[in-house]
Structure formats: C-alpha cells, structure tokens
Amino acid sequence: KDIPWKIYPNHPDLSVEQEVAEYNACATNAFGEWRFEDVCLDFQPDIVVDIRDFWMMEFEQRSPFRRMFHWAIMPTVDAYPQNEQWLETFCKADSVFAYYEFGKSVLEKETGGQINTVGVASPSAASCYKQVANKTQHRNSMGIDPDSVIIGTVMRNQRRKLYPDLFKSFRQILEKTQKTNLFLYCHTSYPDIGWDIPRLLTENGI
C-alpha cells in the first residue's frame, strides 16, 4: 500500500545469497544493525527513537553518525540492579523515557542522576484499550463462551522466559480444578529463538 513515509525493510532478499550471508553473520542484524548506517546516510534523521531492549538498540550508540541525531530511547527496566554496560549506554542517550515510575527511579538511582530521564510514557488513551462495558456480550461477539476463564500472558518466546513452568502449572490447575472452561492465551511469537512450544504443549497434554 502507498504510505506517506519511507520504509526500510530489514529482512534480506532470500534470492541474494550474499545478502542472506551478511544478515546471518551477526545476531543483532535481526534488530537492524546491518541496515542502520545505510538508513542514516539515506534518510539523514534528526531524531532516532527506539523503544526496545538494550541488545536491540545498543548498536545505534556506536554508530559513526551518532553525533548527527538526537537519540531518544525507552528501554525495558523491570528489575534492579541493572547491568552496568546497559546503564552506560542508556546514559549516552539524549533523552530517556521509562515505562513506569519504578523503571525511572531505578535508572536515576543507579546512574547517580547522570541519565537524562525526561518522563514516563502515558498509557494509551485509544478507545480500543479501554475496558469493555459488557464482557459477556464482548465474549459472545468473539465466539467465546462467556463463562470461560482466560489466563493470559504477553512475552516473547525466549529461553529466559519460563514457558515450561507456565505450561506445567496450567496443567496442574486443570487437574486440580477439573474445570473445562479454563483457557491459557499466550500472546507470543513462534517460531523464535526460544522454546519449542508445540512440544511443550504436547508434553503437558494441553
């Protein structure tokens, strides 16, 4: 479709062997490292905004064009202490946003106030993110039993995520309650670099 802005695809052309080899040469190329300098040269951005984890964005700080753009980041900070290398990189950003007050306070405390935190991102005001007025009607419209109980999780399929424990625990809940209206909803990606989800589901009889 026609869009009013430039788009720079990151995935290699699978018909070009050299391009595929270059892409596969470094794991962080999946996050755009191999394209970043070319995009900077072509687009010449004044501001680069990145809302991802440290390892998905740190190459931007090492760019030879770093002094040419304002670097605004919003890293995931959900625990402490933070890795010192991460903190050093975050401190080099021109402006840093946090997801919530906890992350902001961790960054400020662990960097001794050397980081330029500019605020906490507000939750979306879009109507689609508001709680539905009638859950029964909403579930019926989606073809879901209104009496069902849905347990949900949102996380990438990575080895550090405890998917095996999650599925094992859900199986235990099913056996303990003997309820047939319990559902586990995983908002995730597959395949990814993590667990073999179909195998885990089969092993746990889910």
PLM feature spans:
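Extended catalytic core of nucleotide-activated donor transferases of GT-like folds
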Residues: 3-92, 101-102
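Nucleotide-activated donor-binding/catalytic signature segment of Leloir-type glycosyltransferases, i.e.
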Residues: 64-66, 194-206
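A short helix->loop->beta-strand "cap" motif at the edges of active sites that frequently abuts
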Residues: 66-70, 93-94, 113-116, 180-182
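Short hydrophobic "strand-cap" motifs at the C-terminus of beta-strands
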Residues: 74, 99, 121, 153-157, ...
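Donor nucleotide-sugar binding/catalytic pocket of nucleotide-sugar-dependent glycosyltransferases
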Residues: 92-134
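Nucleotide-sugar donor-binding and catalytic loop/hinge architecture
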Residues: 131-150, 174-179
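Conserved donor-binding/catalytic core segment of Leloir-type glycosyltransferases
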Residues: 145-161, 167, 184-186
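A conserved amphipathic alpha-helix that caps or lines the catalytic cleft of carbohydrate-
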Residues: 170-174, 201
